[in-house]
From Swiss-Prot:
InterPro entries for this protein: AceGlu_kinase-like_sf, Asp/Glu/Uridylate_kinase, G5K_ProB, Glu/AcGlu_kinase, Glu_5kinase, Glu_5kinase/COase_Synthase, Glutamate_5-kinase_CS, PUA
PROSITE patterns reported for this sequence: GLUTAMATE_5_KINASE, PUA
SMART domains xrefs: PUA (SM00359)
Superkingdom, natural source: Bacteria
Native organism: Burkholderia thailandensis (strain ATCC 700388 / DSM 13276 / CCUG 48851 / CIP 106301 / E264)
Source organism phylogeny: Bacteria, Pseudomonadati, Pseudomonadota, Betaproteobacteria, Burkholderiales
A biological process term (GO) from this entry: L-proline biosynthetic process
Coiled-coil residue windows: none
Protein name as it appears in the record: Glutamate 5-kinase
Enzyme Commission number(s) from the entry: 2.7.2.11
Molecular function GO terms recorded: ATP binding; glutamate 5-kinase activity; RNA binding
Amino acid sequence: MRSIIADSKRLVVKVGSSLVTNDGRGLDHDAIGRWAAQIAALRNEGKEVVLVSSGAIAEGMQRLGWSRRPREIDELQAAAAVGQMGLAQVYESRFAEHGIRTAQILLTHADLADRERYLNARSTLLTLLRLGVVPIINENDTVVTDEIKFGDNDTLGALVANLIEGDALIILTDQQGLFTADPRKDPGATLVAEASAGAPELEAMAGGAGSSIGRGGMLTKILAAKRAAHSGANTVIASGRERDVLLRLASGEAIGTQLIARTARMAARKQWMADHLQVRGHVVIDAGAVDKLTAGGKSLLPIGVVAVQGVFARGEVIACVNDAGREVARGITNYSSAEAKLIQRKPSGEIEAVLGYMLEPELIHRDNLVLV
């Protein structure tokens, strides 16, 4: 089996905390130097690389003399602010050894949820790549809150792959890849060499939290691959402990788990809706509505809604889930949660009689709805 990275030109490489730190005790300068050397070699082969790197909080903890990751958000943000300085400095100096300039970009979910800011971020990244600069991206932990955070850099890496229409996302971790079961508990567990990104059985195989240093477990990586597939990007999950792993992947060697994007690439606007707008609520829909959305490409009408969950306003994104709780679609709602509760299970012709007005006959128009 040949690595999908060999034929990929534009890469997003995500490096986890454990691969750039000394077991959480500050940055590992030598390790960062090796990543810089490999990326420089990829550049010489004509590949474009965007690096998503963890490590700011771990470096901040070291500089502040903290041995344990704090739980308070203000202390985490303080550590990120202190550590981001060191992270940027080390990357800049290590890449400079190869004659490569770097750029620091800090993002939050809010940056990508706003369409204008999303397009500005995309334009900046593409310009940096055109100029031969290696963008180094991290979540802006200093200002992030629960409502605007990505939660982990695996997710951020996938969204960046969507943003720049990358060919592949490489998630480097301290694990060999995805196994059929937890190899620490099941001696019969085997490595999944290749699968389709978004295959339901993958989520059942993955699970467990990340290390105390970082935040991402294997499940977040599987979900990241599913997101990356929305823009046609394939994903490789591999061990960053493997010698010259990036160079070997680029040469065609199959390492780790390859998750192939086999679904059709989403239109740009729907991809943005699916991946960058935060879900504010849920509606449970009946089997008939599920069929109309998934097979018929229809709009969601109020009559197909069984229940409304959460509080949301007109124009916000809501998820459509089946009776088992599985999300099948999401989209921009024409009605608030209060209005939706009043018109659920009602034919569209009765909306005006119930509310006193009718904004739209659909709860979500098909042009504002995307399957997930």
